[in-house]
């Protein structure tokens, strides 16, 4: 978890063991428009603010990593989630 801007390439490179030749990343970001499920209305987003109870969030991330590594043949998994105010287009999470 971080309050700083996330560098997607840097995060991916930190978790890749030397024996791996490729990475797969999910890059989540703050989007400009959101569709309301119940009404179908499209609303414009000005910015996002992420908050977390960090001890619990980190514990849940570790559980998620454990589940994924148990189900798939994956060498390593890393998750970085942004906290604080994000402007449109800024990265919110990298997995």
Predicted regions and their residues:
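N-terminal, polar/charged subdomain of small-to-medium soluble alpha/beta proteins
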Residues: 1-91
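Phosphate/diphosphate ligand-binding glycine-rich loop within oxidoreductases
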Residues: 95
């Amino acid at each position: 978890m971080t309050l700083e801007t996330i560098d997607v390439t840097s995060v991916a490179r930190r978790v890749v063991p030397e024996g791996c030749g490729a990475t797969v990343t999910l890059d989540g970001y703050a989007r400009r428009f959101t569709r309301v499920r119940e009404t179908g209305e499209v609303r414009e987003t000005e910015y996002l603010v992420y908050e977390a109870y960090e001890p619990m969030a980190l514990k849940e991330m570790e559980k998620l990593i454990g589940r994924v590594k148990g189900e798939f043949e994956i060498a390593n998994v890393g998750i970085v989630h942004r906290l604080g105010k994000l402007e449109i287009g800024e990265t919110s999470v990298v997995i």
